[in-house]
Amino acid sequence: MSKEDNVINNFEEQANELMKERFQKLKELQSNGKDPFDVYKVERTHTSKEVKDNYEDLEGKTVTVAGRLMSKRVHGKAGFSDIHDRYGKIQLYIKINDVGEEKLKEYKTFDIGDIISVTGTVFKTKTGETSIHITDFQLVCKSLRPLPEKWHGLKDPDLRYRQRYVDLIINQDVRDTFIKRTAIIKSMREFLDNRGFLEVETPILSPIAGGAAAKPFITHHNALDIDMYLRIATELYLKRLIVGGFEKVYEIGKNFRNEGIDIRHNPEFTAIELYEAYADYNDMMEITENMIAYICEKVLGTTKVEYEGAEIDFTPPWRRLTMVDAVKEYAGVDFNIIKDDIEARAIAKEKHIEFKKELKDCTKGDVLIGLFEEFCEDKLMQPTFICDYPVENSPLTKKKRGNEAFTERFEGFVFGREVCNAYSELNDSIVQKERFMQQLKERELGDDEAYMMDDDFITSLEVGMPPTGGLGIGIDRLIMFLTDTHSIRDVILFPTMKPQPNNQ
């Protein structure tokens, strides 16, 4: 058994003993007619922040606050305590002359983690700390399970995620991260709403998993007796809305991909997709860099952020680099002079590039993508748009003007990681059907992430979709950068976890 396991087991043993004591205290309260769970509402007049921010107006006046008891230093006939609410902590002062001997005795029985309401007058201590001089109090929830005293000392990589409620209680920086998350998404909506975009909702359950190259989650609809998929992207439904005349739309929501879990990937994640009629991928670059700059200024007050010790500058314009130029710069391979698939495969073999399918089935475009992923991605530290992807790897995208071997697609990279993906959207129904047919062949070759045929989407394109620019951003990854967070699990309140055995 590891040292960390011993620490955890010792804490659990101590917790079990403390829980017995707390259960006994609860029984005594209930027998005395003071059951905290009979409290239905607290008439709170102020939060901790409001008391501190308005001290000059509140000095000497009576307020009622409520929160979780997080420290208690009461000995003899007086003492101090701290309670925490959503906005932070505030100090309490209790004295026997103000509440009486019995009430002080009751207060001393309270445990760390209990939730109380307090009425008292506002004052400042000799050290200048805004505090509340208690005249009355009430226990409104008894905490039966003790909080760990040294949460980070447990060194259990999973425990903070499994018991996020405790993590939020103990760690102010964790609360701050999720408050920033809300502000980031709010600012994103604000930016798009100001530009005339319409927020919409599209299905999460669908008979076809489309819009991205990914493995879906499969479920079964009993009433219809059909298999359905949790969406892997919102793209194809949003494009249907462009066909329907909604010229600027976006959706912020959950996508689901039945793939691996690591510091950058969670099976359930939040993304935004937006589409604008009569626009192209150049317009999507402008929206991307200006929206992220807007969010940075709004939430952080600057477009220069620190991430893992490095400064990232989100100030527009971002660097623009074609994939061919990136591979030439970082891998030393000039695809402008490579003639065909055979020559490209020889380079892939020389560079030891691995693919999901056999090398003999790889195209020149497959090799270009492979070289980019192997040699270029981790070099792209500052915000960079990598443009013009091979046509065989971008089935929903218009061909590049002037070079039909490529498409008008870009991905945005920051700190060596992809954060967004955008196209000049393909709106030719005939070509789109051909692309889907080619994707079906890829599935037959073993690529289970290749696109499925979506006949209804083809039908919508036959009705007619105007030239359109589309953009998708992984919100969780963006939040990681803007909060200097290493793992995606630290920006998702309840990340996907493997269930624990029943006895743990």
Swiss-Prot record:
It is found in: Cytoplasm. GO terms for biological process: lysyl-tRNA aminoacylation. It catalyses: tRNA(Lys) + L-lysine + ATP = L-lysyl-tRNA(Lys) + AMP + diphosphate. Its EC number is 6.1.1.6. It comes from the Bacteria. Binds 3 Mg(2+) ions per subunit. GO terms for molecular function: ATP binding; catalytic activity, acting on a protein; lysine-tRNA ligase activity; magnesium ion binding; transferase activity; tRNA binding. The keyword NADP does not apply. Keywords: Aminoacyl-tRNA synthetase, ATP-binding, Cytoplasm, Ligase, Magnesium, Metal-binding, Nucleotide-binding, Protein biosynthesis. InterPro entries: Aa-tRNA-synt_II, aa-tRNA-synth_II, aa-tRNA-synth_II/BPL/LPL, Lys-tRNA-ligase_II, Lys-tRNA-ligase_II_bac/euk, Lys-tRNA-ligase_II_N, Lys-tRNA-synth_II_C, NA-bd_OB-fold. Homodimer. NCBIfam families: lysS_bact (TIGR00499), PRK00484.1 (NF001756). This is Lysine--tRNA ligase. The gene is lysS.
